[in-house]
Amino acid sequence: MTISTLDLILGIIMGIVTVRATMRGFVDEFFSKASILCAAVVAILCHKRLVPLTRVLLGHSILLPCITFLITFMGVYCVMLFLRSRMRTYATRDLISGFNQVFGFFFGIIEGSVLLTVILLLLHVQPFVSVSHMLHESVINTVLSPLVLDGVRYMRLKM
């Protein structure tokens, strides 16, 4: 079996993501992703409920929902950064630092797999260039095809 150009490119991406996560460690890598994700989710879900409170503090404004969203996002993000700094102090101890690197490696593999799935999903869905020949030759596409094809079907239903 030959390795296609797409497999080579995706393999390099996977390697970079995995090595980066291993070097940074699980705590830093996980909290760098979780802080943005949690802050965005909490801000999206809660900013409308907090608008009356910020209206009392800031008065009436057209930009009040945007300001409330930003305040909520930054507040949750700062809390997550504080938790990250606390966890980092525990993760840098001699006994746990090795586990931090090992878990970072596995987290990098998971993160890289998700990234490759998203890239393949976008390659399947995009209408600009025909990449079906490249995708057909790809071993990585064959391995991840159950996830990718379900995503393609879902996206085509929503479009």
Swiss-Prot record:
InterPro entries, per database record: Colicin-V_CvpA
GO BP term (any one): toxin biosynthetic process
Keyword annotations from UniProtKB, A to Z: Cell membrane, Membrane, Transmembrane, Transmembrane helix
Main location: membrane
Highest taxon of the lineage: Bacteria
Gene Ontology cellular component annotations, sorted alphabetically: plasma membrane
Compartments reported by the entry: Cell membrane
Transmembrane segments: 5-27, 34-51, 61-83, 103-125
The UniProt record lists the keyword Transmembrane helix: yes
Membrane topology: Multi-pass membrane protein
Record protein name field: Uncharacterized protein TP_0522
Organism: Treponema pallidum (strain Nichols)
